[in-house]
């Protein structure tokens, strides 16, 4: 019997707090519309692109240059390990520099995405007021907006 009542609650939609617990700034549509999939997609793209376009090339080039410098005698090889420590360090530094050099591109992707979603969970306007026009928001905030838009008689 308890499973029937929980099943009925699931059909109504996502769980919303009771009206007594909701703040005056609550808007059910804006709370339900969070773009997590798009954000995770941008993060994944940034990770893949930064690896293939910057980190891997920087790492390989720095390793090849370091090996060339060791081979031509500009850098001394370690007597026990040879050129391996210097080449490995160059690869790690090149990888880190490549990842760091791609930060600006990822930031621009997030800024362009933020511009598309202005007010829907991003930016300085987030959670200040209901930016979507929903029926509950119209009824709750309609009276207060009408009062504030009328000029005072004094």
Curated annotation (Swiss-Prot):
Region of interest: Disordered: 1-23
Keywords annotated in UniProt: Acetylation, Endosome, Membrane, Mitochondrion, Mitochondrion inner membrane
Cellular localisation: Endosome; Mitochondrion; Mitochondrion inner membrane
GO cellular component: endosome
Protein source organism: Bos taurus
Protein's recorded name: OCIA domain-containing protein 2
Gene Ontology BP, a term: response to bacterium
Highest taxon in the source lineage: Eukaryota
